Each structure stands twice: as structure tokens, then as C-alpha cells.
């Protein structure tokens, strides 16, 4: 039977499959056509993410059904020098005691009108 796989870019891929094929097999066929590794693929049908070990019949996927392909997001750690820079950028600030505006580290007066450009500033509290 024939099914369609729609990507986020709007491209539609046509696959020739059997209802007894597993989701793993479908992902392998997508890899053959598009070059996307199966571990980065997520297939969605009827609002549900399809699990690798199950078959197309388990999800009641019939001929000319459309699956949606999205890519798995990968997280990662930040390099230590970039982490220090991010921490400095996010934590080295002054806070107005009247209106709680965040200001640059060397600020003397608040930039907001609602507190009358107050000079009552404090350093931003450090995250523990």
C-alpha cells in the first residue's frame, strides 16, 4: 500500500509499505529517500507520536494515510567560556528598588519615568 509522509518544509514523500511493517521499517525507508537518520525522526499520525516497535496496523494506518515527520530536537551543554559569558550577561545587572527595572551594571539612575529616574539601585541577586 502507499502512504504519504509530510515534512515540516511542506514536502510530501510517497512510500510503498505493508500494514505489517514496523515504524522502524518506515523510518528506514525515509532514511533511504531523504537521508535523515531514524534516530532523529519522529512520526506523527492522528496527533500521536508513533513508537518504533509497533506496526502500521497497530495505529490503524491505511492506504493513502498521511504521516507527519518532525525532527527530534537535541539538547547539549554549553562550552564553559560561553556559560561564563552568559552568566555575566544575565546576572551582572542593577535593579531599580522602586520599579524593578533591569539596568546595565554601571547604571547610576533608572531609565524609567514611572519611578522618576530614581537613583535607588541595587545589584541583581546572584542565583545559587
From Swiss-Prot:
InterPro entries: Ribosomal_eL40_dom, Ribosomal_eL40_sf, Ribosomal_zn-bd, Ubiquitin-like_dom, Ubiquitin-like_domsf, Ubiquitin_CS, Ubiquitin_dom, Ubiquitin_ubiquitin-like
Stored Gene3D superfamilies: 4.10.1060.50, Phosphatidylinositol 3-kinase Catalytic Subunit, Chain A, domain 1
A UniProt-annotated Pfam family: ubiquitin
Crosslink position(s): Glycyl lysine isopeptide (Gly-Lys) (interchain with K-? in acceptor proteins): 76
Residue ranges of domain Ubiquitin-like in the record: 1-76
Signal sequence, start to end: none
GO MF annotations, alphabetized: mRNA binding; structural constituent of ribosome
PROSITE patterns tied to this protein: UBIQUITIN_1 (PS00299), UBIQUITIN_2 (PS50053)
GO terms for biological process, alphabetical: translation
UniProt keyword annotations, A-Z: Cytoplasm, Isopeptide bond, Nucleus, Ribonucleoprotein, Ribosomal protein
Coiled coil: none
A single cellular component GO annotation: ribonucleoprotein complex
Cross-referenced PANTHER family: UBIQUITIN (PTHR10666)
Protein family (similarity comment): In the N-terminal section; belongs to the ubiquitin family. In the C-terminal section; belongs to the eukaryotic ribosomal protein eL40 family.
Anything else known: Ubiquitin is generally synthesized as a polyubiquitin precursor with tandem head to tail repeats. Often, there are one to three additional amino acids after the last repeat, removed in the mature protein. Alternatively, ubiquitin extension protein is synthesized as a single copy of ubiquitin fused to a ribosomal protein (either eL40 or eS31) or to an ubiquitin-related protein (either RUB1 or RUB2). Following translation, extension protein is cleaved from ubiquitin.
Protein name: Ubiquitin-ribosomal protein eL40 fusion protein
Annotated organism of origin: Brassica rapa subsp. pekinensis (Chinese cabbage)
Amino acid at each position: 500500500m502507499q502512504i504519504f509522509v509530510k515534512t515540516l518544509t511542506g514536502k510530501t514523500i510517497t512510500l510503498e509499505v505493508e500494514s505489517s511493517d514496523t515504524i522502524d521499517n518506515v523510518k528506514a525507508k525515509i532514511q533511504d529517500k531523504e537521508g535523515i537518520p531514524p534516530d532523529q525522526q519522529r512520526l506523527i499520525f492522528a496527533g500521536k507520536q508513533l513508537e518504533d516497535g509497533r506496526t502500521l496496523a497497530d495505529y490503524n494506518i491505511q492506504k493513502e494515510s498521511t504521516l507527519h515527520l518532525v525532527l527530534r530536537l537535541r539538547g547539549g551543554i554549553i562550552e564553559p567560556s560561553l556559560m561564563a559569558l552568559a552568566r555575566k550577561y544575565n546576572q551582572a545587572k542593577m535593579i531599580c528598588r522602586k520599579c524593578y527595572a533591569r539596568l546595565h551594571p554601571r547604571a547610576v539612575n533608572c531609565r524609567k519615568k514611572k519611578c522618576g529616574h530614581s537613583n535607588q539601585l541595587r545589584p541583581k541577586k546572584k542565583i545559587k
